[in-house]
Amino acid sequence: MLTAFRPNSPTAIVVRAASTNAKKLEEIRERLAKGPNFQDFVQNPDNLKSVGENYDGKLRREKGEEQRLRLPPWLKTTIPMGKNYTKIKEQLRELKLSTVCEEARCPNIGECWGGGENGTQTATIMLMGDTCTRGCRFCSVKTARIPPPLDENEPVNTAKAIASWGLDYIVLTSVDRDDLPDGGSKHIAQTVREIKARNSNIFVECLVPDFRGDLDCVETIANCGLDVYAHNIETVEKLTPYVRDRRAHYRQTLRVLTEAKRFNPNLITKSSIMLGLGETDEEIERTMTDLREAGVECLTLGQYMQPTNKHLKVIEYVTPEKFKHWEERGNDLGFLYTASGPLVRSSYKAGEFFISSILANRKANQSKDSAPKN
């Protein structure tokens, strides 16, 4: 039996409500589709300013306040996907290789593994296992006093995987292995040599530990055939004992970077600073100056993100326009390249694209200089 549809009936009210909700949902989808994403931030600095200035949420946690800050919109990323992303992930599992992209929960994993806007595909392989001997309060990598022994096949397996991926730029990082006499420096160096033996054109960056300040280990890495020697200072001097493991020291980091450049002047040296841990502008400026005086040529600055409830809380979400300010200061201080943005990480691919250009130009100039003159 059919009944008449009455405008004021419960059914009519539900239909009108559903229609209104559908319309609102469509409006939200349209706004999201038309809104800026992180690529827009990279390509258009003006967008950074408007997004940061228009956000009315709380960006700084006051002293003694326990509640976590709400994530601002410029730190939200898309789910990683794509053929190249899937290919790399599957091969990593097959060869039992670890990446810092996954272990450290990097927000840029989809962009880096997939190739992104400029087509430069990058990945960051984490050597010597997934367990570190240090326990920095910002890092989500597992820790143990004595991790499992090194896999002697890892250098060859890593090189084979990288050769099959067709990457342009590879970053090798590692856990700290204070339990080993050489800190694993020979293992890292052998991996670089295996990679270069299979593809001499690929650019290799090594983001390495401080090796407890052992300069023999630093020299081993500096002269193994890599292109970029990276070691992160992580934070300002005042916060270093609070943020990093007690065996890591601010001045020791500067010395490692200085000596790496002395051992091999042709290297590009690189470091990274996290913001949002309670540092002041003056302290950031001092750290950047210290790095430049240590001969560091490339610098990245990014937002610290609390990986789990057990790690340091974020004190402040730094606005995109503030990151832009630090990029400009880096250029003023004379860094060859400064990558500064909320989602920038030490192995961020936009920086690698630029560094690749620097390295290619240097190699071309070296070839010209070594060519026989008529």
From Swiss-Prot:
| Molecular functions (GO terms) | 4 iron, 4 sulfur cluster binding; lipoate synthase activity; metal ion binding
Q: Where is the Radical SAM core domain?
A: 117-336
Residues annotated as binding [4Fe-4S] cluster 2: C132, C136, C139
What else is on record for this protein? This protein may be expected to contain an N-terminal transit peptide but none has been predicted.
Organism lineage: Eukaryota, Metazoa, Ecdysozoa, Arthropoda, Hexapoda
Identify the EC number(s): 2.8.1.8
Alphabetical keyword list = 4Fe-4S, Iron, Iron-sulfur, Metal-binding, Mitochondrion, S-adenosyl-L-methionine, Transferase
Q: Which GO terms describe its cellular component?
A: mitochondrion
Tell me which species this is from: Drosophila pseudoobscura pseudoobscura (Fruit fly)
Q: Which domain of life is it from?
A: Eukaryota
Chain coiled-coil ranges: none
Protein's name in the database: Lipoyl synthase, mitochondrial
A Pfam family name for this chain? Radical_SAM
Compartments where found: Mitochondrion
Q: Pathway membership of this protein?
A: Protein modification; protein lipoylation via endogenous pathway; protein N(6)-(lipoyl)lysine from octanoyl-[acyl-carrier-protein]: step 2/2
Asked whether the UniProt record includes Iron-sulfur among its keywords, one would answer yes
Write out the catalysed reaction.
[[Fe-S] cluster scaffold protein carrying a second [4Fe-4S](2+) cluster] + N(6)-octanoyl-L-lysyl-[protein] + 2 oxidized [2Fe-2S]-[ferredoxin] + 2 S-adenosyl-L-methionine + 4 H(+) = [[Fe-S] cluster scaffold protein] + N(6)-[(R)-dihydrolipoyl]-L-lysyl-[protein] + 4 Fe(3+) + 2 hydrogen sulfide + 2 5'-deoxyadenosine + 2 L-methionine + 2 reduced [2Fe-2S]-[ferredoxin]
* Disulphide bridges, residue numbers: none
Main localization (coarse): mitochondrion
Q: Where does [4Fe-4S] cluster 1 bind?
A: C101, C106, C112, S347
Q: How is the cofactor bound?
A: Binds 2 [4Fe-4S] clusters per subunit. One cluster is coordinated with 3 cysteines and an exchangeable S-adenosyl-L-methionine.
